[in-house]
A protein has these predicted regions:
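Conserved binding/catalytic microenvironments
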Residues: 1
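A short, surface-exposed helix-loop junction/capping segment
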Residues: 5-20, 200-212
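A conserved helix-loop-beta module that forms one wall/lid of the active-site cleft
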Residues: 8-80, 85-93, 101-117
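Residue-level preference for alpha-helix termini and adjacent loops
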Residues: 23-24, 47, 79-82, 131, ...
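A short, hydrophobic/aromatic-rich structural module that often spans a beta strand
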Residues: 50, 174-184, 206-213
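Phosphate-binding site of ATP-dependent enzymes
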Residues: 96-200
């Protein structure tokens, strides 16, 4: 079995892709615009809060019951908040915690300051989108949150694929660094043949205990 480590992967990305293309995909909003222009479905943008002036005038009460807020140039799922409904005093996060408007404003301030951005320290923007629901085919595998599928291609040729499955620990986020399960997919039949949680191999999703392999 050939293993592609993170360092080698990053080296190949830098070697095989134009610098401007890499810079573009590190920005969620710009990536969405490019995908939409190419006819790829993307979630609508509720708001892009670009600076403190935007934050001061933004009407947080206008937000829907369920939404996601994330740094435009975020990394490893840091700074992503998933909101699943309104409650007295604010909103309910996907993990059950209450999020007040004051807390949300403070979070946006941290995003704008670049505390949660890929570069770290450079100014960023806060992207707000509707909360996307799990596809029924994934529903049996995850208790909540939004799984996704990642495919690594060389040109137009797919080389490997994985699905990222949120857990209670990850707060519904499909980010491995936040505690999601990473599961390798066999191209021949679409089945999962290996899964990891953190540094450990697993055979089941932790909650509920659903067999993956």
């Amino acid at each position: 079995m050939t293993i592609l480590g993170m360092n080698r992967r990053n080296a190949l990305i830098a070697k095989l892709n134009p610098r401007e293309a890499i810079k573009g995909v590190n920005q969620k909003f710009e990536t969405k615009e490019r995908l939409a222009a190419a006819g790829v479905p993307v979630p609508p943008t509720l708001a892009l809060i670009a600076d403190e002036a935007d934050a001061a005038t933004f009407d947080y009460a206008s937000l829907p019951q369920a939404f996601a807020i994330k740094p435009n140039r975020g990394r490893r799922g840091e700074g992503v908040i998933l909101v699943d409904g309104r409650v007295e005093g604010g909103w309910r996060k996907l993990n059950g915690e209450v999020l007040t408007e004051r807390m949300l404003r403070a979070h946006v301030t941290r995003i704008l300051a670049g505390e949660l951005s890929l570069e770290g320290g450079n100014s960023d923007a806060a992207l707000i989108e509707p909360l996307i629901r799990t596809h029924p085919d994934f529903a049996r595998m995850v208790p909540f949150g939004l799984p996704d599928i990642r495919i690594i291609c060389l040109g137009d040729v797919p080389l490997m694929a994985m699905t990222r499955l949120p857990t209670e620990e990850s707060g519904g986020r499909a980010n491995l660094h936040q505690g999601a399960v990473g599961a390798a997919i066999d191209f021949r039949d679409g089945r999962i043949f290996r899964a990891v949680l953190g540094q450990e191999a697993v055979w089941d999703h932790p909650a509920p205990a659903t067999a993956l392999i």
